């Protein structure tokens, strides 16, 4: 299960190298709580806001994409500021962090059920690669899986490849730096040279 956690974020279930499910929907707005995006909400919420607040589609779109998530919960749009406020004990941010972590753990749990188990968790992107605190809070919620975090390695890992679980941990956890540009370039090349999407899937 990959946890791509940055300003935007997604959780993805991968089995035998193939994506089984992802928290994103038609757009990256769906899924977990993000820096300024709301993540999954009741589909009626935007309609209710438009009706009761007399807002336009564009205004609600801006609210859901740029004024929600951790920013809406705690008042900070930058994850580093949000984390610092959490460590200071700001009540709104402490509650916001609980909501944020819960949304991530909920998707991980759902994907474990969908795949019938999990071998490894991967943390990547800005927060996933650099925040030992967020990784620790997530993994602590998953300790029932037999995950044993290596706190020393976890705290020291910032943007580098590392295994952050102890030797013998039943489920392993890794930090793996992302390279979205390279993946886009490779997929574009495959799309250009493959006769059909099915051929592209086999090539990967």
Model-derived regions: residue spans:
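Internal helix-turn-beta structural module
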Residues: 94, 98-114, 128-191
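Short glycine-rich phosphate-binding loop at a beta-alpha junction
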Residues: 118-126
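Conserved small/polar residues in nucleotide/adenosyl-binding loops
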Residues: 192-199
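Hydrophobic alpha-helical segments, chiefly the membrane-spanning helices
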Residues: 203-204
